[in-house]
Design a protein with these regions (language model features):
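Canonical pleckstrin homology
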Residues: 1-72, 200-202, 301
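Beta-strand-rich domains and repeat architectures in extracellular enzymes and scaffolds
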Residues: 86-122, 144-148, 184-204, 208-209, ...
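WD40-like beta-propeller blades
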Residues: 41, 48, 52-54, 58-93, ...
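Structural signature of WD-repeat beta-propellers
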Residues: 115-118, 207-208, 250-253, 298-301, ...
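Blade-level signature of beta-propeller repeat domains, shared across WD40, Kelch, NHL, RCC1
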Residues: 403-406, 410-412, 447-463, 477-514
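Short coil/turn segments that connect the beta-strands within blades of beta-propeller domains
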Residues: 108-109, 200-201, 244-245, 292-293, ...
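Long intrinsically disordered, low-complexity regions that are acidic and Ser/Thr-rich
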Residues: 1-24, 163-192, 401-404
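Structural core positions within WD40/WD-like beta-propeller blades
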Residues: 112, 204, 247-249, 296, ...
Length: 514
């Protein structure tokens, strides 16, 4: 009996010593994580008081990770909001679009859509109110094809104030009050004049003649297009707002130029003296997008990374075959999605290493969608099939095709699966009375040329009096709703009821996510 008690005591002492050793062991009470930042993956260490708390946290973290992965791969639910028929002059094709924020933070944004041919451009401004979406204005701009457009936030300018230490607190308070009042009057006067870009969001529109129009987001395009204009030597191929500046790429023959426009001293933009950025791009720059401190640049079949803070380039990497050119690109998080000219292949690239992670083809899905159509229509659409636009929304990659179909797949599947599960964009209307689901597929009869996600604010219908008076309860009064805009030629609902005469009319389909 004494021997058993001695053994039990020794075992309990051993367990206690082992627990103390595990609690004091830094390897068992710490978790090493790789955190994704704007500069890539960086190590991060979490330390816990003991190994037990570390194991509990690790189990909870793994469960949350599995739940998040299931949420990211699940197909988002959406419904058809409205369809806008954008009647333009014959020959004009939709070429680019951008989302422009409203006058206030909680205001509804606007959608600027450009249509163009070889000799002219046209800009339509659409109001995205909570009710009906309407076309506010439609104006001509320039005498050449519109090639690029981007929304540029107002330039930031640090205010320099020299304060002498001998001044009293009352004097400093009076000066600060005067500064606030004077700055407010300046803002009001500038907004009233409408001829200055100081402190206002602007829309930059470039065309084939090398003209860059800088238009205030709150003014009429027709009356102000010639007030702020930069004339460049070569055709504009791409534009991008990055780190308070604007990058504009131009090209002619084998001359490729990258220009950097900076804010002016008056709070506007210096359009007369752009800075030339040295680069190694051998082909025209077709796309530029900012991610963190870098700008990803597509030139020819290669990707370049330009660091805005240092002005240096990462060595370029060839992504496509030498005979192909990158024409479509979308950058989000850790991944770059791109496609070549007249190609049905989509490549997934790591944004930091610029290495190809995966690539897949959309031909088989489009062929299955066209299986019930007429033979001549099926042969025509399959013969000229290509990926026409790309965007990312709700953790999914959205793909527009020349056949008019809009496809989607989760980013998780796109980055690793050579044959990801592609779905068609559709409107689902649930009939609760009959307990049935009716599905109506809608696309374009011609190419889908633009896909653009739009975030619109939604306000609380019945906020309490306390919420109304509190300035810290903005999230309780305001939330956002995501819409996906599909812009293309004609309308196709999967039946033979549509009028063929509307196939040449540009249509915008607004899908609302729930």
């Amino acid at each position: 009996m004494e021997m058993l008690e001695t053994m039990e005591t020794d075992n309990s002492m051993s367990i206690r010593e082992l627990n103390e050793k595990m609690s004091n062991d830094p390897d068992l009470s710490a978790v090493n994580l790789d955190v994704l930042t704007s500069n890539g993956f960086e190590p991060f260490v979490l330390e816990f008081p003991n190994a037990e708390k570390r194991s509990v946290w690790e189990a909870t973290f793994k469960d949350a990770k599995i739940t998040l992965a299931k949420h990211l791969t699940a197909a988002p639910s959406w419904s058809l909001k409205t369809i806008i028929a954008h009647q333009t002059r014959p020959g004009l094709q939709l070429c680019t679009a951008t989302v422009v924020p409203g006058k206030r933070v909680d205001s509804t944004p606007f959608l600027w859509v450009c249509a163009s041919d070889k000799f002219s451009g046209q800009v339509a401004v659409m109001a995205l109110d909570s009710g009906e979406i309407t076309i506010e204005t439609c104006s001509a701009i320039g005498n050449a094809a519109v090639t690029a457009m981007c929304t540029v936030p107002p330039p930031t300018r640090p205010r320099k104030r020299k304060i002498k230490s001998q001044k009293s607190l009352e004097q400093l308070q009076k000066e600060s009050i005067m500064d606030i009042n004077s700055s407010g009057s300046d803002t009001e006067s500038s907004s009233d004049e409408g001829t200055s870009t100081a402190g206002q969001t602007t829309v930059w529109i470039g065309n084939d003649d090398g003209e860059v129009f800088v238009v205030n987001s709150t003014e009429r395009i027709r009356s102000r297009t010639r007030d702020r204009l930069a004339r460049l030597r070569n055709s504009v191929t791409s534009m991008c707002a990055a780190n308070g500046n604007v990058l504009v790429a131009t090209s002619y023959s084998n001359q490729v130029q990258l220009l950097l426009f900076r804010p002016a001293s008056d709070g506007g933009w210096d359009l007369e003296n752009p800075q030339t950025v040295g680069h190694v791009c051998q082909a025209p720059i077709t796309n530029m997008q900012q991610i963190g401190k870098r700008v990803i640049i597509a030139s020819g079949n290669s990707l370049h990374a330009f660091f805005m803070d240092t002005g240096k380039f990462q060595p370029p990497v060839e992504i496509l075959p030498s005979s192909d050119v990158i024409t479509l690109m979308n950058v989000t998080g850790q991944y770059v999605f791109l496609s070549g000219r007249k190609s049905t292949e989509i490549y997934v690239v790591d944004v930091f290493e610029l290495s190809v992670l995966n690539h897949f083809n959309v031909t088989s899905f489009v062929r299955s969608q066209l299986s019930g159509r007429e033979h001549i229509l099926r042969e025509h659409k399959m013969g000229c099939l290509r990926v026409s636009c790309l965007t990312v929304a709700r953790h999914h990659l959205w793909i527009g095709t020349s056949a008019g179909f809009v496809l989607s797949t989760s980013i998780q599947a796109a980055k690793s699966n050579p044959t990801p599960d592609l779905r068609g964009l559709r409107s689902r209307n649930v009939k609760l009375i009959n307990e049935m689901v009716s599905v109506c597929e809608i696309g374009h009869s011609g190419p889908c040329r633009i896909l653009l996600p739009v975030q619109t604010p939604t306000h609380s219908n019945n906020p309490s009096r306390k919420q109304k008076r509190s300035s810290l309860n903005v999230p309780t009064q305001q939330s956002s709703q995501l819409m996906l805009v599909s812009c293309g030629e004609g309308l196709d609902d999967g039946t033979a009821t549509q009028d063929p005469s509307t196939d040449a009319i540009n249509h915008l389909i607004f899908w609302k996510f729930s």
